[in-house]
Amino acid sequence: MNVSQQIEPRAAASERNMADAIRFLSMDAVEKANSGHPGMPMGMADAVTVLFNRFIRIDPSLPDWPDRDRFVLSAGHGSMLLYSLHHLIGFADMPMAELSSFRQLGSKTAGHPEYGHALGIETTTGPLGQGISTAVGMAMAEQMMASRFGSALCNHFTYVVAGDGCLQEGISHEAIDLAGHLKLRKLVVLWDDNRISIDGSTDLSTSMNQLARFRAASWDAQAVDGHDPEAVAKALERARRTRKPSLIACRTRIGKGAASMEGSHKTHGAALGDKEIAATREKLGWPHPPFFVPPEIRAAWAKVAARGRTAREAWDIRLDASRSKKRYEQTIRRQFDGELGDLLAKFRSAHRTRATKVATRQASQMALEVINGATALTIGGSADLTGSNLTMTSQTQPISPGNFKGRYLHYGIREHGMAAAMNGIALHGGFIPYGGTFLVFSDYARGAMRLSALMGLPVIYVLTHDSIGLGEDGPTHQPVEHLAMLRATPNLNVFRPADIIETAECWEIALGEKNTPSVLALSRQALPMLRRTEGNENQSALGAYVLREARGNRDITILATGSEVEIAVAAAERLQAEEGIAAAVVSMPCWEKFEVQDLAYRRKVLGDAPRIAIEAAGRLGWDRWMGPDGAFVGMTGFGASAPAGDLYRHFGITADHVVAEALELLRRAYSETLPIGARIGPHPSAHTVRSSQEA
C-alpha cells in the first residue's frame, strides 16, 4: 500500500474550520495575556491542520509512546499554535483554562514551549534554530533504533515547523548540511515562508534562495501555497516517500485571516487588539465568544487523537509479539546492565596498581573502552576532533548514510549542530549521546548546551585541551573563562578530573545522571595517578574530597582541580619538608556535586585553616570556596603560544609560586613576627582541624 492510500481524506471546508479554531484560540490567548505572538499560529494554522488531520500519529492518552511521530515547533515564539493543537486533540493537561492562562506564572502555557512543562512537548524551543537542529538528532535516533529493532517497532517521522528566523540562524546551516549528508529521510520541515521578520520584510536582511540552499545540501525541496490544504497534503505525501530529508516551503501570510493586519509584521509579537479581533471574527464567520470551540469542530479534532490511539494500539500488539520486546524496553529506558559499575571499579583498581600516568583525555578513552564494551546505549561522536578528543573506541563503528547500525557520529566542524543533535538523540530515547570538541569551542555550542541543562537531558560533553596545557596552539585555543561560564549554568555538572582514577569516576557519575547533562574537561598533557588509597568508593561523586591530609593539624588547605592537583600535591609536600607547614590538598573534580553535600562534610573537607586555590583558568567562582581571605593561583588574562611547561612557568602556575603564595597568605592570616621556617599553628580564631587519621 502506498503512502497516499494510507492517508484518510478530509474535506477542505472542515479543515478550514479546524484551522480557524487554532487562529481564534491563539488570538484570544495572546489578547488576554497582552503578550505573545499571534501572527505565526494564524499563518501556519492551515498547513499544520493538514499535517495533524491527515498524517501525524500521536496518542494524547499516552504522550510518551516511543513510536509516535515527533512534532517540533522550532519557531517556538508561536507557542499558541502548539498549545491550541494540544487542547484540541485532548491532552489531559491542556484544558481551556490553561489557554486562558497563557504566559502566566504557574501555567502550563509558557511563553515558549518547554520540555517537561506540559505533556507532548518534544523539546524546548524559542532560541531560533534550536528546534530544527534538535530534530535532526531525533531523526538520527529514529534511524538508529530502526536499524536495531526493525520498522515494526520503530517507524515514525519527525516533523518540524520552522520560520525564517530559524533558517537564518547559523546553527541551521550545520544541521541542514548534516541531515542531508546522512539522508535522514524521515525528517520533514515545514517552513513558514511568510517573508516577515520583526523589523519588517525579510528582504531587509536576506536574499537567500532557501530552496536552492536545501537542495545543495541534498534535501528534497518543494514550494506550495501554505493556505491550500490539498497542495500541502500532496507535498507531505511526496515528503514521506522520498529518500532524503524534506523541506516544504509553505508560502503563507503572517496573521492570516486578520481583518486589516494580515501580512503585517505588526502581528508577529503583539496582541491584535479588541477591535481587530472583533473584525476578524466577522470576516471569518466565527461568531463564538473567546475561548470557545464548537462541538462539531472538537469532534473533527478528536478524530486525530483516535487515529493516533489506533496506531499506538497496533504497535502495542507488535511489541508484545516481538522477540526483542525485553531488549527494546531496556533500550528505550536507557537501562544499564548491572555489571558496568563493577567493571569500572576493576578498571580503577588496575590502574591504581600500575600508577598509570596519562592525559585525562586518554584516560577517558580508556574508560570508554570499558563502558562501550559493557553497554550498547552510548553513541559517541566528535566535531572533527576524534583523534584529539579520543572519543572513539573499538566498539564504536561510524554511522554513515544508509548505515545506522554504528555507534559513532562524525559531526564535522559543527560544534553547535553536534550539541543540538545530541539533545535530540537524548530526547528521542534509547541512547546516551556523548560528543567531543576542545573546551574553548564550547563557545560555539553554548546555545544548545544551555538547553541540555534547561531540559535536564543526560548528554555528555567531552571537552578536551582544557587549559594553557594544550600549549603551542595559543590563546585562541586555550580556555580561560570557559569553566566559569559552564559552572555558572544551572543544572550542569562540570567535571575536571585530576588523574585516571577520577576520570573513570566522573564517567560513572555522568552515565548515572538522569536529568543533568555533564561536561568532562580533560587535559592534553599527561598527569600522574594521584589517588593511591584503595577502595571502591567513588570519591568524585562527593564533588570534592581530601586527597592528601596534612600531617597533624592543618596550617593551610590547597584546593585544586584537574591538572593543577598535581601542582597542589607538590606544593604541599614542599611546604611540609621545607617550611614545616602542614598542608592538606583537596581535589575538587565537580563543584556542583560538592555544593549539594551536607554542611558538615563541606566543613570537614575545606577545614578552618587559610585556603589557597589553583586552577589554570580565571578566578571567577573560586572565592566561595577559598573564603574572603583566600589566595588564588591561576590565569588573569589570555594565554600565549608556547610549550605547555613554559606557559605554566610564565603564568606562575607552579609549585614554587604556590609555596610563595601560601607563605604570604599565612603571614597575613597569622603574624608577621614568626620566622619563615617556624611551625605555624592554627589560626587563633579557628577550630582545630585534625587529619583523617586523627579524626
Curated annotation (Swiss-Prot):
Active site: 415
Pfam families: Transket_pyr, Transketolase_C_1, Transketolase_N
InterPro entries assigned to the protein according to its UniProt record, in alphabetical order: THDP-binding, Transketo_C/PFOR_II, Transketolase-like_C_2, Transketolase-like_Pyr-bd, Transketolase_bac-like, Transketolase_BS, Transketolase_CS, Transketolase_fam
Catalytic activity reported: D-sedoheptulose 7-phosphate + D-glyceraldehyde 3-phosphate = aldehydo-D-ribose 5-phosphate + D-xylulose 5-phosphate
EC number: 2.2.1.1
UniProt pathway annotation: Carbohydrate biosynthesis; Calvin cycle
Record-given protein name: Transketolase
Gene source species: Sinorhizobium medicae (strain WSM419)
Gene name tied to this protein: cbbT
